[in-house]
Swiss-Prot record:
Known function: Part of ribonuclease P, a protein complex that generates mature tRNA molecules by cleaving their 5'-ends.
Locations listed in the record: Cytoplasm
EC number(s) stated in the UniProt entry for this protein: 3.1.26.5
Enzyme class: hydrolase
InterPro entries for this protein: Pop5/Rpp14/Rnp2-like, Rnp2-like_sf, Rnp2_archaea
Gene Ontology molecular functions: ribonuclease P activity
Oligomer status and interactors: Consists of a catalytic RNA component and at least 4-5 protein subunits.
Pfam families attached to this UniProt entry: RNase_P_Rpp14
Protein name, per record: Ribonuclease P protein component 2
Predominant location: cytoplasm
Tree of life domain: Archaea
UniProt similarity note: Belongs to the eukaryotic/archaeal RNase P protein component 2 family.
Gene name of the record: rnp2
């Protein structure tokens, strides 16, 4: 199957957030509560249009991906989150960005919520063991 051209792909925004709660929560708990609060506020169709995904969550801070046309609705849905695992909690959006890297640099300076792996580039023209 062919990939979509870059001009036809949906554009995304990345929201950096912090969770303020009585007890620590895991990534799965956050995903469940974010989708639940979005669905109750916006309805199933608009929640689907928002395309909300939790990319990373660590030590109370994380990154959520959403559609660029639905950032306001996503922020509103995140503001309605009041409980995680039955304990009082609130989700505070620190800011929005067009790339994960910039969201991490600007809003999550001391956290490693989303660190892509760095792979070494190898020169495929050289054969191993052969001296030039």
């Amino acid at each position: 199957m062919k990939r979509l051209l870059p001009s036809l792909r949906t554009k995304k925004r990345y929201l950096a957030f912090e969770l303020i709660s009585e007890e620590p929560a895991g990534r799965g708990d956050i995903v469940k509560e974010v989708i639940s609060s979005a669905s109750s506020l916006l309805g199933d169709i608009t929640t689907s249009d928002c395309d909300i995904r939790v990319l990373g969550f660590e030590a109370g801070k994380g990154i959520i991906q959403c559609s660029h046309t639905r950032v306001k609705e996503t922020r509103a849905a995140l503001a309605t989150l009041t409980r995680v695992n039955g304990k009082r909690a609130t989700l505070h959006v620190l800011g929005a960005s067009g790339t994960v890297k910039k969201a991490t640099e600007k809003f999550l300076k001391d956290y490693t919520v989303f660190e892509p792996e760095i792979h070494e580039k190898r020169d495929s023209r050289k054969t191993p063991g052969k001296v030039d």
